[in-house]
Amino acid sequence: MSDLDERLRRRAQKGILRPELRVGVVSFVKSYVAHINLRDAGNPSGTHFEGGRYGKGEVGEFILVEGQRSILLGRIMEVRLPDGERQIIGQDYAGSNELDAIGHIQLLGSISMVDFHFTAGVDLYPRLGDRVYAAPHQLIALIPYLMIRTGDGDTPVQLELGAVGDANESKVSITPEKLFGRHCAILGATGGGKSWTTARIIEECIKHKGKIILLDATGEYGEFS
């Protein structure tokens, strides 16, 4: 059994829909968009679970919607209050469980309840009242693997590029075919980690004895051999 299969087995044993990470319920559904009522958005901070921090309603957080036949993966793109309740948050606001916040979700893909295989797009749209959970960091880290996993025991070469959050076992790996199969560009602001990311990719390719043609005008990567 490969390391990725072992990580998936442990995650499956623990479950991917954890009651400790429940975020809210679906209140509105549209093509590739859903709104959820956030039950913990009024709390002054998030929560820690299995070594990682979860906002439970913060912008950018990945979430799971418990559907009838599959689990939907989404991401919180916006959090707001109804216009009539905005005055609740004043200069002395210290948190409240009664805050009626709404999260706007972009639906990204579907996860099979049988083998956790991930496919882009929505197989079946959620229903009003479906429960929503923060996605465990370990599951998000396995998404690239779940898109190509065949179940025949043959694990392809994986380039380890980083990690999701600060949880254990949340390292993200991707196959060279997925990374280099089409145009690949590393973009970001100054100090955003472009050079580090490039160096990481080169290191991983060298580790797996990959062949690279490197045009290094500034000599930044001259120490690689």
Report the location of each language-model feature.
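Glycine-rich phosphate-binding loop of nucleotide-binding enzymes
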Residues: 156-225
